[in-house]
Amino acid sequence: MEEPRHSKRPRFLAPNQASGGPPTEPGCSGVDREDPVDPVQPAKPTAYVKPMRREPPARAQPAPPAGRGQRGGGSWRAGRGRGSGAGLLRALGERVGPGMYLVHLNDHGELGYQGQLEARQTPAFSFTEAALMPGIVQEGPGPHAAQPEVGLQEPPPAPGPVAVARQTMLAPSPSLSFRPPGGSSTLCIVQTSNSTIVQSVPVFPAHSAH
């Protein structure tokens, strides 16, 4: 009787069989198989985009309005002031401060020139200058020397627009009066908040007896 031949091929045992553990299932090798490697996937496509800069459309500046000509026949030059009529104010009026212009109006409420202004304020001057005027105050003692009289006096009435402006004053204004020697009138100088008024007041015989 022949003995069964043993295969000469080396037989690999699983670790659990070598240590006496239960045999592994058929078809399963003792070596742990690695996870199947996924095929190399193509990378995501890269898009090269050129950035475009969007600029707002430029505003079209309106043409300057055509105005009346100046006295010399020229055209008005549009200014760069805040308002639309800044150039007109700069051309018509006189500058009284930063960004401020004094514009004269005629009787109809229209823009006029400085020559059309009927009443203008007289420049104010101090009483010291009035006292140094020649022919009014005489130096040296004498009974007939002009004696200044300082007091409060209402401004003399005046016709026209100046009288309307003076009606707004509520308090009397300081005044300075001079009577020249041998003269028939008294020079009154009234200082107001807006201007200085100089007026000659006639002296009647009843007042000259003082």
Swiss-Prot record:
Region (Disordered) location: 1-82
UniProt superkingdom: Eukaryota
Ranges annotated as biased composition (Basic residues): 1-11
Pfam families: PRR20
Compositional bias per record (Gly residues), positions renumbered to this chain: 69-82
Regions annotated as coiled coil: none
Family: Belongs to the PRR20 family.
Protein known as: Proline-rich protein 20G
Source organism per UniProt: Homo sapiens (Human)
Gene that encodes the chain: PRR20G
